[in-house]
Each structure stands twice: as structure tokens, then as C-alpha cells.
């Protein structure tokens, strides 16, 4: 049989019926019927007039819409009409009509075979049934074929299968008006079928009687089912009549009609009387269209030329009872609050992205609410318990209650019989918390379905493969079933019954026609699968504390925002003067909902427009948009990147300083270890070198005029104890203190960050200027300030103790001018105040093309920021007339030479970091010579860049790494050889493309004085007077280790005083020069 589903309209086209029959013969729809059941079904389908379906002609497609009654709008309980060969059960009038209409709806299915017609011989027709009572209602059906009084008897050997979804006709029949509740409806007994190629349909309107037939022996394929009363939330049923089956044990057919007795169904009266007027009009229209339909069907029959033959039913054959179809399978998802048509759809829904997102959001909200009860947005909100949403105000809550989404959920819950919470708003004062219960993943396997079925029939708890499913009804849902389970013998053969996955019980009492079979099935389930019947269901416990809404609380929620701008919302009327929509002139928007007018006036968009165009003093809450939020996040990300960059830079500087100290510590440790070794070697009689100690090497590694000594095994590096100790001790005294290094690092980093902000400010100003004016040019130019770089001793790491001046170079995209310099000097104090609370003194030195920044706290540091641009050097390197390029220069351009010097300082710093920083002892010797240039006036004229080049060349040209003492000696040897004198090769600048001597600024006298001083310092080094060169006191001598090999005749010079007095007063005078 066909279950009732809330489908409202469908259309059948005869040209497609063959394909449906093919699917039916292939067992496409999954129903199992025996052959006798199929024949009984065919007999029933052929004789009952279809009052709910209009079959169309092959050339014309006709359809209609069945309107359901408001009372039974959500009824999903199936009602079945048994076939002529099954047990006749008394039923209410609307249910019987539904069954008759359902059976008639499938009476016109052709068979799948088109070549063979299975005909049977004529048999004597049985005695006609008695005439119907006077109250029998005759239906005038609007069929599109000609009726005939001679039913055909042609049977198909194939079985008929029905699809449980196409049941709109049954719902339509249930809504037909009925003159009386206790009226008797009859069902005809003769069987009829249709031949394969027939297109002419004949069917006589016969009276119907319900005949009680002796039930046949139950077959294993027989399906017993339960008929549940229908419930409605609009008007509940007062009392449900008990369905009492009537059985007669006789060998012949009985025509005794079985009728209903008892109270009337008040739940159906609204549907019956509301559809009376529409049904009467339909009957009048059907009578008018009958003549035209009959003529069209007659023409079709004449064209086909086929007739139907009637075959009398078998008098002596006992028919097997026919299986009714399965009840409807309803799949409901409590997370998404939707229902699915079948298990495949429900499975796909569970695997879909929408369900997973909602489930993840639900879990996240539960975890968040359980961990933090004061989450954002949970205070002062109106909550809808049915939809599980929160509204920020009373207007939004009212709009949600009227909305389509809420109504859809209400309709679905009403149809499923689920409890519907009250629509009264509740103020949420705490977030929801959940108690997660472990649950198995929903599946649709047959084993789980069987287990679920057992649970439904035996335990009065509707558990299934779906989550959160509950049933409504009386507490005595299936109370008698449990007692019957234990009373049934265990050795009885269990019958295979088909039960729905989920039966929603909406009435007061559960009634069934197959209690015995169901009890046996329940016993089998309890015996075989007692464990699988228990399905874990996840429970979500709502810990939300909802307070009853009082008028005061609603007023408090609504008083936060007052509507503004009533005068700017005008009513738009049509020609009849009816208001069709509202138009807001401020927001330039229209809406047709009168309830939305007040909400629009309170909305943030309208208030922002009102503030912008009418009242700037209106207070509007700050709620950044997605774009503004993204911009803010981008700014924060950039700020974090800046902070990370400066932090890494400071760490690199700190690491560099630590590595320098580590190198010094390693040197001292290695020197002390080797000191003991060489002291012992020096006291050995034959120790040392086999050919005597090697003499000092020349500049190129070989003494001039002497053959190279034979090379033996590579000796260990011989440290000069006194020279290295003195050099490193001097270096430790001239190295900056920790306070000075931190002060330099602080002021330099603050200055660099402030200049970056100044660059951003100037760039924004230029953009605004271009937007206000004509932005056809200047649109694609770079920012005015491109970057700031460290130069000089700061970049090279040559700071000495007491140095307070460092240099920075600010690169510009254009040639720097006095105007740009003044603008930077004006903006720099503002940006410095943003970065650091300390005070700084800023001076603008136009002659130096620089800005001088002085700190006001100890130790006072000075930063010189020189402006330059690479364009100046590019123009200077061009061939031809330079004045042609200078015509474009601004009138207040800064000093060209100062800018070129700043560019040269950039190249020098880059070269030094690449060549000299990694050279052993190079940085230490340059610091020693810088201190020498500051102490001795003769050396003050030596250019620092030339000295750096000379030291790097002298140390890098050595055959092996040099210790600090050897490196200093080697540098003095180079200068003493006359490399800086006039006529010598000189020192070419590696950072210039054209040959350029770095000593060009020195006079001849200065060159000779420095060369002479270097020669005298070399003599002092030879006589162990390096402390005089370095300007420091002699270090205490290390303790002597006396041994038997010490056969020195002269006394060791260990008194710590100068041993150079015996040389005469000449050496004393030369020492005074240092």
C-alpha cells in the first residue's frame, strides 16, 4: 500500500508510464510482494475510482493541485487500505477515503512487457454485491478517458511496485468533505487489469463494500504494521477510537460491511467542513468537463481498436493476504533543524559542509561558553529557544519571530510532533554550556536499523541513527508490549516484520493490528541483539540561565538606541493611495515592511547617515566594518613586523659585541697557554729552531736581499708575549663601555624609527595633495625619503671610548633641497615624541646638508643625519656637459659635495663590512691606530679611510693569520718602507671607478712626519718598548721559572722600568714625541 506524504501536486504523463513500470519490475523501489499479493493489488487498483489524480491524454498534459486542510497540514501518520484479499479493518471515514484514493492513483500503471498479452479465459462472474445504502456518496471523477461497464481481465505476470513518495492523491482524498463520520464506504471485489497496448480505459462506477475475508496462512513475506492515530497541534484529538478487526472463519465470501462505531474525530472536522465548499465547486466543474473528456477518450479508443475482456474471479481459490508497504521514513537533524527525505539524503547531509560547519560552530560555542561564561555578546540578549539564536533587541526578536526561517522551523517541529517552546523572549544572562556524551557516528547500516526497530517496538523510547530525536505523546506509549514480550514462548518461529525507522507518535494511545507478530519480533530482538539495541544518543544540556522578560528589561534593551530621522522616511503610494513601500532619503533605500521602518530608524547605517548629513553631534557606537578591521589588522601586523625587525637588529648588534668580547677572551686564554710553552722552549739549550730563530719578514713575506730559509715542518705560531699583551690591554682600555654602547644603540634606533614615520607622513601628504589636485602626474612616484643607513665608525664597528658622534645617511628619491630639509626638521620632533618620551635637541645645518640630533640625558650622544640622493652621483658620472643636468635642480638644492661625501661614506661602510670585518686582528689594529691618531698630533693628519685601507692590505697580504702584536708591527713596517711618501704607488680607493689616491689630501711634510714616526715606533717595538708607542704604563712581568738550563750571563730586565736609558738621550727625545 501507499503511505501518505505531504506532497501537494504532481503530474502523470502516460508516455512515461512504461519507464516507471520497468523500474517497478526491476524491484527498483525495494518492496517485496508475493504473486498473489500482486494480483490482489492489481484487482484493487483496477476497480477503485481515482478521485485524486487526473490522468492526461498523450497529447495533452493535465495537472492539478491538491490543497490540504489546515488542521491536517502536518499529519504524517500513515493510513492504509487493505486489498480485497486481506483482512478488512474498520477505519475512520477520512482514512478510508485516503486509502481509496491512494489505491486509485496507481490503477493506471501499464505493465513492463509490450510484446506479450497474458489473457485468461472468461469465468462466471460472482453475484453482484447488494446495493449501497442511501447515504453512499458517488464520486464524479474527471478522467480523460471513456468509461465502460465491461471491465477487462488481463493479468500481468510481473509484480507491481509502488514508490512511497508519490502519495499526494491520498492526502487530497483525506481532505474531501464527508457527509457523516459513521458513513459506510464499500470496496468492490472484482479484479481487473489492463492489457499492454491498451489506451482505452473503461471503468464503471460501482458501489463499494468492505468484505470480511477469511485470512490466509501468514507468509514470511507478509508485513504487519501499526496504525497510529494522527495528532495535530492546532486542535488535539479528544479521544481515539479503538480499531477492532473483524474476522470470519468461513469458506465463502461474506458481504457483511464492517463500519466504525464510537465517538467522532473532532480533529478532522475542521478539515472536513473547510473543504466542503471547494469540493462542491470542483464537482460542478468535473460534471461540465465530463462530456468533452468522454468524447476525447472515445476518439482515442476508436483509434486503438482494442477492447477489454472481463474475467470472473476465482470462486474456490483462497487468496493470500497482501503486504502493505512500509511506513514513511523520516530523518531529522537536530543540529541543522531540518528533515531529510531518505537515508541517502540524510547521510549526504551529515557528510556535507553545511552540517559540519554548524556542528563545529556548536561545539566551539559550547567549549567557549563552558570555559568562559562572560563571552562577548551574551549579555542583554533575547534568545529564541526553538531556533537557538540570540537577538540584540526586542525589534530584532520580533522580526525573527515573524521571519520565514522561524516559521519554517515551527512548521517542521509541528509536523514531526516535537515540542515547541514558547515564543516569549528570554533575556540570556549566561552562555550555554554543554555536557558532551560519547556517541557513535550515525550510520544507516541494516544492523543498526534493526536494533533501532527493536527499541521502538519494545522499550517505548524512540532511538534511531539520528541525533536528538524525541517523541511526544502519552506515557503509556507501548506499556502493554513489554508485558507481552515475556509471555510469548521463546521457541515460536519469529516472523520477519518490517517496521519503520522512526514512528512519531502524536495521539493518546498506540494502536496496532499486528501485536502478535510485533511481540514475536520484539522477543527475537531482545534474545538475539540485546546490546545493539542500545544506541547512544548525544545529549546537549542547556545550562543557559534565562530570566523572565519584564517590561522594565525590555524597555532597558530598547532605550539604548532611539530612532532618529522620522521625517526622512517617506511613504510611497500607488494610484489608489495605498502605501506600497517606504523610502529613506538619507540612506537611499526602500523597504515594504511596516515593521522594518522602526528598526531601520534605529539601525546603525541610518544613524551614521543621519550623523553625517544632519546632526554631527549624534553619538553612534563604534563598530568597525570588515574593511576597517582588515586595515587595522594590517597595520597591527606591520607594526609587529617593525618591532620584530628592530628586535632582531638589536640582537644582532648585541651578538656582534659579544663575539668581539669572546674573541678577546679566547685570545687571552690562548696567549697564556702559549706563553708557558714558549718560555720553556726558550730555556732549552737546543730548543727552538734548528737553523736559528727566523728573522723578521719583509712586506711580501721574504726579507730583502736574503735567500729564503729552508722550509721544514710548519712550526707552531710563535706569540710575542709582550707585544700581544700590551696591544690587547690597550684595546681593552679604549673599547667603549657598556653604557656608551647602549646609549648609542638607543639613540640610533629611535632616530631610524622616527625617520621612517617622517617618511610615511610625507608620503601621505603627497598622496592627499595629488588627489586634491590633478593626479595625472606625480601619481607613480616613489616616496620622498627612501631609507636611512649607518655609516662611519658606527657601521664599521670602530667606536672608541668617549666617542659621542655617529653618522647616518638619509637617502632621498630626488635631489635634497633646503625645503625638504626644513620639513624633515619640523616633523622629526613630533615623531620622536611618539616613539620616546625623552627630549631631544634638533638643529638644521644647511651648510652641512644635515640635521643634527642631540640627546639631553647622559651620556649625551649626537647623531648627524646627512641628506643625499643617488641621482647626484649618476649625473656626476655622465659624460658631456654637466651644467645641462644642473638646470633642472631646484634653486635651494643642498651642497653637492656634502651629498657626494655621504654617498662615498655608504660605499666605504659596505666595503669595510665585506673585507675588513672578517679579517683577524684587523679591527683591533685599526682601533689602536685611531687612538694613536687622537693622541699624537703627528698622526692626526692621517686620513682614516687611507689608514683602514692600509691596515687591511698589510694584514691580508700576510702568509698566515697575524696576532695583534705581529699585525701592528707589520703595519708600522709598511709605513716605514715609504709607502705613503710622494712618488710612491700610493693607496687607490677601491670604491671609486676612476683611479683616486686616498692620500691626495696630505702634504709632503705630513707624509714625511708620519713615515718618520712609524720608523721610530718600529725601533721601540724592536727593543720591547711597545708600551711607549701605545701610551700606557709597562705591565708587570710574569714570574720567571728558573731551571738548570738558564745560563744567561746578563741580568734579565725584570724591574719594570725602561731599559732604554743606556741608549743615550737621543732615544729619550724621540720618545717624547709620543
UniProtKB/Swiss-Prot annotation:
Q: Which InterPro entries match?
A: DZF_dom, DZF_dom_C, DZF_dom_N, Matrin/U1-like-C_Znf_C2H2, NT_sf, Znf_C2H2_sf, Znf_C2H2_type
One Pfam family cited in the UniProt record for this chain: DZF_C
What keywords are annotated for this sequence in UniProt? Acetylation, Chromosome, Cytoplasm, Developmental protein, DNA-binding, Isopeptide bond, Nucleus, Phosphoprotein, Repeat, RNA-binding, Ubl conjugation
Tell me where in or outside the cell this protein is found.
Nucleus; Cytoplasm; Cytoplasmic granule; Chromosome
A single GO CC term for this protein reads: chromosome
What domain of life? Eukaryota
- Please tell me which positions the record assigns to the cross-link Glycyl lysine isopeptide (Lys-Gly) (interchain with G-Cter in SUMO2): 509, 541, 623
Domain (DZF): residue spans on this chain = 703-1073
Q: What is its quaternary makeup?
A: Found in a cytoplasmic RNP complex with STAU2. Interacts with STAU2. Does not interact with STAU1.
Its biological purpose: Involved in postimplantation and gastrulation stages of development. Involved in the nucleocytoplasmic shuttling of STAU2. Binds to DNA and RNA.
Q: Sorted alphabetically, which PANTHER family does this protein's record hold? A: ZINC FINGER RNA-BINDING PROTEIN
Put simply, this protein is called Zinc finger RNA-binding protein
Q: Which organism is it from?
A: Homo sapiens (Human)
> Which gene carries the instructions for this protein?
ZFR
